[in-house]
Amino acid sequence: MTHLSFPNLSGKLVDLRELSIEDAIIIVSLMSHDISEYLYEVSPPYKIGDVLKFIKFSCDGFRLHKSIIFAIDYKKKSEPIQLLVETIGIKDIDYVNKKANIGYWIGKQYQGKGLATECVKLVITYGFDILKLIAISAYVFPENKPSIRVLEKNKFVKTEVIKEYHPLSNSYRNSLVYTIKNKK
């Protein structure tokens, strides 16, 4: 599978596009301790240098066909321009076994508006229809109930509980794995 150009996806509430350096300051402002405690790859405090590394990592992942990380723009009707509200991506793409992982987060002030649910739907549709994946999984902490609801609304099912999976300070946190299979 080769990517010719970065895909842009569009839904009723959001547009998904390639991340850019110009997004860095907004991402820092949206990242809070409340959000980062539920993310596997982010530790507070999240600084501009961290975001720039993430954007470079995202661009490299796309170039190397390992991941597709999208910026999420909210099509808020009351705003003259779209608002960046965070990121979603297909990661760890395995073209041989036709599977990948999904990860996402939404700025706290934009949660509860259906944005994550629509973003996940757009990305799994792209993964199944364009990338021809047969399974997409998500790793989520058991206490992250909003993310679990988003996955369940999109027909993901809990497939595994991994005990003491993710390091946190001097201990480890449990993780749940949710998976959706391509029915086509």
Q: What does each model-found stretch correspond to?
A:
Residues E41-V42, H65-I69, I134:
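Short, polar/charged, Gly/Pro-enriched helix-capping and turn/loop motifs at alpha-helix termini
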Residues S36-F57:
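Conserved GNAT-fold acetyl-CoA-binding loop/helix
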Residues K47-G49, F62, N170:
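A short hydrophobic/aromatic micro-motif that marks alpha-helical segments and, especially, helix-coil
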Residues M1-A24, S29-E37, D73-K184:
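Acyl-donor (CoA/ACP) binding surface of acyl/acetyltransferases
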Residues K56-A71:
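A short helix-loop-beta-strand connector motif used in the catalytic cores of GNAT acetyltransferases and
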Residues S43-K47, I68, E143:
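Short, conserved alpha-helical segments within structured domains
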